[in-house]
UniProtKB/Swiss-Prot annotation:
<feature type="domain" description="FHA">
    <location>
        <begin position="441"/>
        <end position="507"/>
    </location>
</feature>
<dbReference type="GO" id="GO:0048787">
    <property type="term" value="C:presynaptic active zone membrane"/>
</dbReference>
<dbReference type="GO" id="GO:0051015">
    <property type="term" value="F:actin filament binding"/>
</dbReference>
<dbReference type="GO" id="GO:0060019">
    <property type="term" value="P:radial glial cell differentiation"/>
</dbReference>
<dbReference type="GO" id="GO:0061003">
    <property type="term" value="P:positive regulation of dendritic spine morphogenesis"/>
</dbReference>
<dbReference type="GO" id="GO:0046930">
    <property type="term" value="C:pore complex"/>
</dbReference>
<feature type="modified residue" description="Phosphoserine">
    <location>
        <position position="1245"/>
    </location>
</feature>
<dbReference type="InterPro" id="IPR000159">
    <property type="entry name" value="RA_dom"/>
</dbReference>
<feature type="modified residue" description="Phosphoserine">
    <location>
        <position position="391"/>
    </location>
</feature>
<dbReference type="GO" id="GO:2000049">
    <property type="term" value="P:positive regulation of cell-cell adhesion mediated by cadherin"/>
</dbReference>
<dbReference type="GO" id="GO:0007165">
    <property type="term" value="P:signal transduction"/>
</dbReference>
<feature type="modified residue" description="Phosphoserine">
    <location>
        <position position="562"/>
    </location>
</feature>
<dbReference type="GO" id="GO:0050839">
    <property type="term" value="F:cell adhesion molecule binding"/>
</dbReference>
<dbReference type="GO" id="GO:0046931">
    <property type="term" value="P:pore complex assembly"/>
</dbReference>
<dbReference type="GO" id="GO:0048854">
    <property type="term" value="P:brain morphogenesis"/>
</dbReference>
<feature type="modified residue" description="Phosphoserine">
    <location>
        <position position="1282"/>
    </location>
</feature>
<dbReference type="GO" id="GO:0005911">
    <property type="term" value="C:cell-cell junction"/>
</dbReference>
Length: 1829
């Protein structure tokens, strides 16, 4: 609270206290409030002693902060009531007034309760009561209070009463009987409750006296109060209109409530309604505690001359709440009789009805009503009920299906006729009987067809004969039927009318939330014409559809209808304009708190009180969460039960106070049961699979029930404790559920660290993590958990993933995880999580809570080798603090060909982080620590909105089934209310029913529909549709639907205005969107022309149970590089943003690609599909109209390599193989690839084929182009970089600009080879690294070298379940595909794609020097590359010529494009040519490469070679001689492999103590050796038989697999050797540390020995010191009688004492002694400073010999026997100050009761001992005496 607010609060409180003190006795004066608003006062308490039969009283002073519990404990001590008790009684404190009492809650403040009496100057008492006491039988009749017999003491003694006592006893019995009869007539007092007797007993036994009251002068106070109230009311009368007669007095009788009080007079205005008069009357009669809603005022008409008490001939009518009694009384004609008003309890079965007033049980006749029923409450003619024609001029009652209402009340058809029904009988037929009658003509209409009777507010229709066809709501009737507003009447076969009762609808407009919006109406009854059909277009009644009802009883009325004027009554006018009547209704409507019968829930529940516990237990304790269809059924049932307890249907005999207590008890019982269930769920075996389901189920129900109770205007005020407990339960269930899901996630977390090289079926995969998350999300949605809770829960799960991975990175340096390789793997796996979060609308939570691990992996994979990288690192990894950055960089494991990270770079990065991230953390109050906190430091927040009650209408599906078993067993009964508005928020606080009804009057029927309304919308696109869509499957739906997530401001949809969030898009331009995926739907929507026709199901999301989808946050975030040509940022949402921007995609009218070009891809394997969905979900090119590629194919054409879908996720495969399109001449590489590390061992041709390793050539191999015969051509398109990329490296801008400008000049598709920045390490929080593999053929790959360019090879997985993953750093690339054949078709095509815009968030601009260095390196590389390209040109030309000739011959040759001979020059993936070579489409080279040592067998499954590839694979050596030489080498290599296997097997077999790993390896080697032997035999046979090429291919594949496995094993050995070296180094470090520890330990031992020696010397010194002390003492005692002696001898000083230097201040305290050398000399004190130390009195005289004078240093350095002399006495104050200055801080806390030995032992152990001296009392007195001299 602000200071100003607190001051204002204090001032108000002070005024209240001042008023209290002015009226109360001085004893009970209350103090003024403190700054904390606390005050004190004296209170009187009474104690009812049941055993003694009397009351005791005590006054105690109480604070405003003292609770009831505190006061009870104090009073229990004061009254001592439990002296005789054997058990501990339970006490309660009651606030007692004359009118009743109530028990105080435990946490109420009694003094505050007493101060509240100030409001009405009430008097009261506080009574302490033992709840365990039984009521003594007939205690009231036993003895009088003045002569109480102690029944608790003497129970069997019965003495004879005297005459006087007998008389008094009889008198008391008579009084008791009278009181009992009073209580029977006043059920409000709750005569069945013991508490109701307490007030009577207190005031009977302790009558009002000056002793028992608090008010000082009650008569004066009450008189003053009445005077003030009267003056205030009179002022109101005068100020209303100035007339003196606008108010007056009215007598209110209460014969049934207070028969002994004739009447009370109240002051009323003529405009005060009856409900106000009720409240005033109750206060007058002393019943102010009662609920006014339970009482009413009835006007009783007595015959003229009759007395009030004479009830014969009296006619009683209960006034409605808004009628004005005084106005009625003044307008009452005196000749009609006497009018009196009675206050009475509202009958439990009474239902207020409009104009249904009973006079002796008979309805009034029309004439009586016209003459005498108005009483000043005349209504305008517009208030009369009427019939409105539905089908004028059509003779078809379905004609209203398509009309709509205009503002003036007319409609689009012929003008409908409207007939007012006067207060009499209206005849209907072909004949005109009088002005009242309605004349109709047509088939089936009889001359006197039927009668419409309007009496007592009830309108009935009665057919006149069996032939008169009369239908009510489609059902033919033959007898009198009562009409309800909204019903349809049909006369004959063609006349259809709607019956409307404005009075009844006026009540509905006041008391319903949504009016007709939710009314079920008669739509459930077969054969009835659906009212909702009519209301499609809006009601003729000023566009407001009105509810219908099938009930046979009128449910509500508002006030007595007045008789119209005589002229009005006799006429039936067809009226067209109805807006005046609507305005009148709006003016007259008046909000009421009382919920009338029509203002009820869609259903209610009834249960017997005897089975209450069983009923609640069945709902809560025995509900199986997995079998409940509507998961929130318990909540809705419990809420209905609460409302039932609060209603008069539940025990109508009890008082409102008791009803409130009952409701509180029921709610508390519910909450307690729910608490037990949630705790029990958590305590059961955690292995049960349904524990998460049960927790989510009860978390959802607890939160929904809490919302119901909080919002309910009646329950919210009385269930505060239950609300607190429920809120705690929601949080508890949330915590348990988070723990449960985190435990499950923890089992699969190793999937993030799954090495793609080690394929193990047992280990968890990332699919398991995604499955866990998906299961959690579907569980929460199934349980209808609030969206805000869902987001909080997944924030916890994302944080757990972040924490687990990050802590593994930074705390396990030996694991090798801090490497480029693992950084890429973890980042790739995190991409799956982010893609999943994006699909679920949780991308913000994922971005936030995965940020640290994402930035850590980005750090591992980005450039960090030169000082220029420092700004990039710090700006990218801004969330990592200095400790975390230091750990990641220092523990970084470099790849074999990767440069080391400079130490100064690490220091600079850490220094920057200390000034930024560390300071930011400290300013937020967080510690800078290495590890991530396991707990997410965010508070749990209960959602304010988004609950089901806002969207659930009527009885939810599944609720009836949930209750059926309970209903069948008789526990309860479900009562649907068809007349209800259908909303569950009917009793909520602040629900504005009328305005809601008025606002919704054009959409009233929608929630009644089983299916949403379908409309057709035509949009004219400007720069896009302006829609954000999302795909989802609703409840009961088999197929996905496309829903509008949001409408972009300013877009075409926004301008049109008909589309809104929650609408379902059914089709676009006639093509259905139902069942399509989100990306597919986006494709269809982007391929539309400038005019789009959409078929829309309005608010389909709500109808299909997807309302929470609209509640999920979709903030507008500017995406960094996701800009269109216009440069405008695009809003970000869960769905697509559908844009069609001409800057990128051509004009909107650009020719559309044919439908056949957009073949839909097949289902992708799990991860690929998920990644593809994510890719399409994030922003990308396939949401825009792409111009046809130069090859004439759409970029969406399916194919192995041509299916490019996404933002920087790269290209994902489809499983289908389609004929290839023509290759694009201008492929644009995807901007982000995974990093790959390649090992380039030295080979014979390395100096010719590859740069030396120190040169770090800055190039990148582009994805390989395939021949026409390959699976598919690559069509790589430029994509805008993903919106999540935060920045691009500095090289990117210059490189891209240079390369793209080169593309404008050249048609060389290889020019991308030097655009290193196109594969920069984009540092994004959501960047995907798992891509690229699906965009190329299975044999293709990407290579890159140079600093920061170590790409982890993306393994190409042809298998359906394969996931694109990085390959090991030191494995060779798979064999390259053959060079593509390119014809001249593509030559000369210029670059026509626009350049991508510069990124929005760039790093610092590159300096000119860096740019120049980059250019120089590039030019050197290009020069080197020119020579290589020239050689390639020649090779290629020769190859092409030979291929045509020798194609068949080459098929029979077993060629291996990437054979693994360590001796031969091997083919390497080709490198594209430089930019300087025009007129080339693709130029690549094959670079020989010496093979690394090992390769995994699994890696070879990616090396699939087709016949065409084999035929063109050996392009550089097509002649047979080279081929023969190579085949010989292969044979030698195979033999060499077998020999190596044999050797290794022999070594392992000879090894005696093999480890488990070695045994496993031996087994694998044996299998491999056998396989190799069989392979050699098979190959020999193959060569002999000269088999077909296919067998050769198989043999080569087998050889490749064998060689790969062999090399993988060798690599494993190398890795193990590396690990052994690491372990050796670790051991050396540990040995060194151990040696240092030993040295330190020896040093400490030496110091200890020295200290021991010192201690022995000290003991000798202290013994001498003690002897000297005794001598001084004796001498001092001797000199006591000689005060003129100049001084006292000092204790001996150490031998090495030196006087302090003159320069040092005499009072300066010496330095404290060293902890580990207490006996080392530090500083020797002067005699003064030694002797003036503080002394501490010690009471034991026997301890004198232990006295040790201790100075500040406790003589830590003293040793010796030199004695000093006392020069002169000093002033006591000077000594004291010096001794205090010399005292060490903290020394006062040491123990002073130690013996000398103990102090010596502490010294020897190096511990500090107190500086205070332990002195005897005598010595202390002596010293004080000496000091005063």
């Amino acid at each position: 609270m602000s200071a100003g607010g607190r001051d204002e609060e204090r001032r108000k409180l002070a005024d209240i206290i001042h008023h209290w003190n002015a009226n109360r006795l001085d004893l009970f004066e209350i103090s003024q409030p403190t700054e904390d608003l606390e005050f004190h006062g004296v209170m009187r308490f009474y104690f009812q002693d049941k055993a003694a039969g009397n009351f005791a009283t005590k006054c105690i002073r109480v604070s405003s902060t003292a609770t009831t519990q505190d006061v009870i404990e104090t009073l229990a001590e004061k009254f001592r009531p439990d002296m005789r008790m054997l058990s501990s009684p339970k006490y309660s404190l009651y606030e007692v007034h004359v009118s009743g009492e109530r028990r105080l809650d435990i946490d109420e403040k009694p003094l505050v309760v007493q101060l509240n009496w100030n409001k009405d100057d009430r008097e009261g008492r506080f009574v302490l009561k033992n709840e365990n006491d039984a009521i003594p039988a007939k205690k009231a009749q036993s003895n009088g209070p003045e002569k109480q017999e102690k029944e608790g003491v003497i129970q069997n003694f019965k003495r004879t009463l005297s005459k006087k006592e007998k008389k008094e006893k009889k008198k008391r019995e008579k009084e008791a009987l009278r009181q009992a009869s009073d209580k029977e007539e006043r059920p409000s007092q709750g005569d069945d409750s013991e508490n109701s007797r307490l007030a009577a007993e207190v005031y009977k036994d302790m009558p009002e006296t000056s002793f028992t009251r608090t008010i000082s002068n009650p008569e004066v106070v009450m008189k003053r109060r009445r005077q003030q109230k009267l003056e205030k009311r009179m002022q109101e009368f005068r100020s209303s209109d100035g007339r003196p007669d606008s108010g007056g007095t009215l007598r209110i009788y209460a014969d049934s409530l207070k028969p002994n009080i004739p009447y009370k007079t109240i002051l009323l205005s003529t405009t005060d309604p009856a409900d106000f008069a009720v409240a005033e009357s109750l206060e007058k009669y002393g019943l102010e505690k009662e609920n006014p809603k339970d009482y009413c005022i009835a006007r009783v008409m007595l015959p003229p001359g009759a007395q009030h008490s004479d009830e014969r001939g009296a006619k009683e009518i209960i006034l409605d709440d808004d009628e004005c009694p005084l106005q009625i009384f003044r307008e009452w004609p005196s000749d009609k009789g006497i009018l009196v008003f009675q206050l009475k309890r509202r009958p439990p079965d009474y239902i207020p009805k409009k104009m249904k007033k009973h006079v002796e049980g008979k309805p009034l006749k029309g004439k009586d009503r016209a003459d005498g029923s108005g009483y000043g409450s005349a209504l305008p003619p517009e208030k009369l009920p009427y019939l409105v024609e539905l089908s004028p001029g059509r003779r078809n009652h379905f004609a209203y299906y398509s009309y709509h209402t205009y503002e003036d009340g007319s409609d689009s058809r012929d003008k409908p006729k409207l007939y007012r029904l006067q207060l009499s009988v209206t005849e209907v037929g072909t004949e005109k009987f009088d002005d009242n009658s309605i004349q109709l003509f047509g088939p089936g209409i009889q001359p006197h067809h039927c009668d419409l009777t309007n009496m007592d507010g009830v309108v009935t229709v009665t057919p006149r004969s069996m032939d008169a066809e009369t239908y009510v709501d489609g059902q033919r009737i033959s007898e009198t039927t009562m009409l309800q507003s909204g019903m349809r009447l049909q006369f004959g076969t063609s006349h259809v009318f709607k019956f409307v009762d404005p009075i009844q609808d006026h009540v509905l407009s006041k008391r319903s939330v949504d009016g007709g919006l939710m009314v079920k109406g008669p739509r459930h009854k077969p054969g009835a014409v659906q009212e909702t059909t009519f209301e499609l277009g809006g009601d003729i009644h000023s566009g407001t559809a009105l509810p219908a009802s099938r009930s046979t009883t009128r449910l509500d009325s508002d006030r007595v209808s007045s008789a119209s004027s005589t002229a009005e009554r006799g006429m039936v006018k067809p009226m067209i304009r109805l807006d005046q009547e609507q305005d009148y209704r709006r003016r007259e409507s008046r909000t009421q708190d009382a919920a009338g019968p029509e203002l009820m829930l869609p259903a209610s529940i009834e249960f017997r009180e005897s089975s209450e516990d069983s009923f609640l237990s069945a709902i809560i304790n025995y509900t199986n969460s997995s079998t409940v269809h509507f998961k929130l059924s318990p909540t809705y049932v419990l809420y209905m039960a609460c409302r039932y307890v609060l209603s008069s249907q539940h025990r109508p005999d009890i008082s409102p106070t008791e009803r409130t207590h009952k409701a509180i008890a029921v709610v508390n019982k519910m909450v307690s049961m729910m608490e037990g269930v949630i705790q029990e769920v958590d305590q059961v075996d955690q292995k049960q699979k349904n524990i998460a389901g049960a927790l989510a189920f009860w978390m959802a129900n607890a939160s929904e029930l809490l919302n119901f109770i909080k919002q309910d205007r009646d329950l919210s005020r009385i269930t505060l404790d239950a609300q607190d407990v429920l809120a705690h339960l929601v949080q508890m269930a949330f915590k348990y559920l988070v723990h449960c899901l985190q435990s499950e996630l923890n089992n699969y977390m190793p999937a993030f660290l799954d090495d793609p090289e080690e394929n193990s079926l047992q280990r968890p995969k990332i699919d398991d993590v995604l499955h866990t998350l998906t299961g959690a999300m579907s569980l929460l949605r199934r349980c209808r958990v609030n969206a805000a809770l869902t987001i909080q829960l997944f924030s916890q799960l994302f944080h757990f993933i972040n924490m687990w991975l990050f802590n593994r990175l930074v705390t396990d340096p030996d694991s090798g995880l801090c490497s480029h390789y693992w950084g890429a793997i973890i980042r790739q796996q995190l991409g799956h999580i982010e893609a999943w979060a994006e699909k679920q609308g949780l991308e913000l939570a994922a971005d936030c809570h995965l940020s640290r691990i994402v930035q850590a992996t980005t750090l591992l994979t980005m450039d960090k080798y030169v000082p220029d990288d420092i700004p990039n690192i710090n700006s990218t990894c801004f969330k990592l603090n200095s400790l975390q950055l230091q750990a990641l960089l220092q523990n970084y494991h470099c790849a074999p060909d990767e440069p080391f990270i400079p130490t100064d770079l690490i220091e600079n990065v850490v220094a920057v982080a200390e000034n930024t991230a560390d300071e930011l953390a400290r300013s937020d109050g967080r510690d800078v620590q290495l590890e991530e906190d396991p707990d997410l430091q965010l508070p749990f927040l209960l959602p304010e909105d988004g609950y089901s009650c806002d969207v659930v209408r009527n009885i939810p599906n599944g609720l009836q089934e949930f209750l059926d078993p309970l209903c069948q067993r008789g526990f309860c009964r479900l009562v649907p209310h068809t007349r209800s508005p259908g909303t569950w928020t009917i009793y909520f606080e602040g629900a504005d029913y009328e305005s809601h009804l008025m606002r919704e009057n054009t959409e009233l029927t929608q929630p009644l529909r089983k299916e949403p309304e379908v409309i057709t919308v035509t949009l004219k696109k400007q720069n896009g549709m302006g829609l954000s869509i999302v795909a989802a499957k609703g409840a009961g739906q088999d197929k996905l639907g496309i829903y509008v997530k949001s409408v972009v401001k300013g877009g075409a949809a926004d301008v049109d205005g008909r589309l809104a969030a929650g609408d379902q898009l059914l089709s676009v331009d006639g093509r259905s969107l139902v069942g399509l995926s989100q990306e597919r739907a986006a494709e269809l929507m982007t391929r539309t022309s400038s005019v789009v026709t959409l078929e829309v199901a309005k608010q389909g999301a709500i109808y299909h149970g997807l309302a929470t989808l609209l509640n999920q946050p979709s903030p507008m975030m500017q995406r960094i590089s996701d800009r269109r040509g216009s440069g405008k940022p695009r809003p970000k949402s869960e769905g697509f943003e559908l844009y069609n921007n001409s800057a990128q995609n051509g004009s909107p009218e650009s020719p559309q690609m044919p439908w056949t070009e957009y073949s839909e891809p097949k289902k992708l394997p799990g991860d690929d599909r998920l990644m593809k969905n994510r890719a399409d979900h994030r922003s990308s090119p396939n949401v825009a109209n792409q111009p046809p590629s130069p090859g004439g194919k759409s970029p969406y054409t399916s194919g192995t390599a041509a299916k490019i879908t996404s933002v920087s996720t790269g290209n994902l495969c489809t499983e289908e193989q389609t004929p290839p399109p023509r290759p694009e001449a201008y492929p644009i590489p995807t901007q982000t690839y995974t990093r790959e590390y390649f090992t380039f061992p030295a080979s014979k041709s390395q100096d010719r084929m590859a740069p030396v390793q120190n040169q770090w050539p800055n190039y990148e191999e582009k994805p390989h182009m395939h021949t026409e015969s390959d699976h598919a051509s690559i069509a790589i398109q430029r994509v805008t970089r993903s919106q999540e990329e935060l920045r691009e490296e500095k090289v990117y801008q210059l490189e891209r600009h240079r390369v793209e400008s080169g593309m404008d000049r050249k048609c060389d598709s290889d020019m991308w080879i030097n655009q290193s920045s196109s594969v920069e390490s984009s540092t994004s929080s959501q960047e995907h690294l798992n891509h690229s593999s699906k965009s190329v053929t299975p044999a293709s790959t990407l290579t890159k070298s140079g600093p920061g360019r170590w790409k982890t090879p993306a393994a190409v997985l042809p298998t359906p379940v394969a996931v694109s993953q990085p390959i090991r750093t030191d494995l060779p690339p798979p064999p390259p595909p053959p060079p593509a054949h390119y014809t001249s078709d593509f030559d000369g095509i210029s670059m026509d794609l626009p350049l991508p815009p510069p990124p929005a968030n760039q790093a610092a601009p590159q300096s000119a020097q860096v740019a120049a260095a980059e250019r120089k390196k590039r030019e050197e590389h290009q020069r080197w590359y020119e020579k290589e390209k020239a050689r390639l040109e020649e090779e290629r030309e020769r190859k092409r010529r030979e291929q045509e000739r020798k194609l068949g011959q080459m098929r029979t040759q077993s060629l291996n494009p990437a054979s693994f001979s360590p001796l031969a020059t091997q083919a390497k993936p080709e490198k594209p040519s430089t930019l300087q070579r025009p007129q080339e489409t693709v130029i690549r080279e094959l670079q020989p490469q010496q093979q690394p040592r090992t390769i995994e067998r699994r890696d070879l499954q990616y090396i699939t070679i087709s016949k065409e590839e084999l035929s063109s694979g050996d392009s550089l050596s097509p002649d047979p001689w080279k081929r023969d030489a190579r085949e010989k080498l292969e044979k030698q290599q195979q033999m060499h492999i077998v020999d190596m296997l044999s050797k290794e097997i022999h070594e392992l077999q000879n090894k005696g103590d093999r480890t488990a790993e070695e045994s496993d390896r031996l087994r694998k080697l044996m299998l491999e050796w056998q396989f190799q032997k069989r392979l050699q035999e098979s190959k020999q046979k193959d060569e002999d038989d000269d088999e077909e090429e296919d067998d050769d291919v198989d043999t080569m594949l087998i050889m490749q697999r064998l060689e790969a496995e062999r090399r993988a094993r060798l690599q494993d050995e190398e890795r193990r050797r590396q690990q052994q070296l690491e372990e050796m180094r670790k051991r050396e470090v540990e040995d060194r540390v151990r040696q240092e520890e030993d040295g330190r330990h020896q040093e400490e031992e030496r110091v200890k020995r020295d200290a021991e020696e010192k201690r022995r010397q000290e003991e000798g010194y202290y013994s001498r010191l003690e002897a000297e002390r005794r001598r001084q003492h004796e001498e001092a005692a001797r000199r006591l009688l000689e005060p003129e002696e100049p001084g006292l001898s000092r204790p001996p000083l150490p031998q090495d004492y030196e006087p302090p230097s003159q320069s040092s201040a005499p009072s300066a305290p010496p330095p404290p002694p060293q902890r580990n050398a207490s006996y080392l000399k530090t500083q020797v004190l002067s005699p003064d400073s030694l002797f003036t130390a503080k002394f501490v009195a010690y009471d034991d005289d026997d301890e004198e010999e232990n006295y040790v004078p201790a100075g500040p240093n406790s003589y830590s350095g003293s040793a010796g026997t030199t004695a000093g002399t006392y020069d002169a006495p000093r002033d006591t104050r000077e000594k004291l100050s010096r001794s205090q200055d010399a005292d060490l801080p903290g020394s006062s806390g040491a123990p002073e009761n130690l013996t000398f030995r103990e102090r010596q032992r502490l010294f020897s152990q190096g511990q500090d001992v107190s500086d205070k001296v332990k002195a005897s009392r005598k010595l202390t007195e002596l010293e004080n005496e000496l000091n005063t001299k």
